[in-house]
């Protein structure tokens, strides 16, 4: 089988994902995202067999179709950033799920904030 990905690396990827920020209603990455995304680049450089799936999610505010496009665009922005730092595009995939996979209640601002997110999943195969 493939070597197991360490808990520490999984934690670093999850911290990075939680620190990805965009302009409101936009797929433009904010500069404060860069440090943690650079950590993802470092992990991928250290582990050439690892791949990353990048998933974008939105809250339920606004039209479903716009949220779907926004979630896809945001995931693609993260992918583009990683490629710009030298990660081979073949190791990255991105997808958007719009508002279809909430992790919190969309009725509250705090819940909506949790639902607006990027998730990154490492694989080693």
Question: What function would you assign to each model-found segment?
Answer:
Residues 1-51, 125:
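Periplasmic peptidoglycan-binding/tethering modules of Gram-negative envelope proteins
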Residues 27-34, 53-125:
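Periplasmic OmpA-like peptidoglycan-binding domain that tethers envelope proteins to the cell wall
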């Amino acid at each position: 089988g493939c070597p197991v990905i360490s808990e520490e690396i999984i934690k670093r990827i999850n911290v990075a994902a939680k620190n990805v920020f965009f302009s409101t209603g936009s797929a433009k990455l904010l500069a404060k995202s860069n440090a943690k995304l650079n950590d993802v680049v470092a992990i991928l450089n250290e582990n050439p067999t690892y791949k990353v799936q990048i998933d974008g999610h939105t809250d339920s505010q606004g039209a479903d179709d716009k949220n779907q496009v926004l979630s896809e665009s945001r995931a693609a922005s993260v992918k583009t950033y990683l490629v710009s730092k030298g990660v081979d595009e073949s190791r990255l995939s991105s997808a958007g799920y719009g508002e279809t996979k909430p992790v919190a209640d969309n009725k509250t601002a705090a819940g909506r904030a949790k639902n607006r997110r990027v998730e990154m999943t490492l694989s080693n195969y």
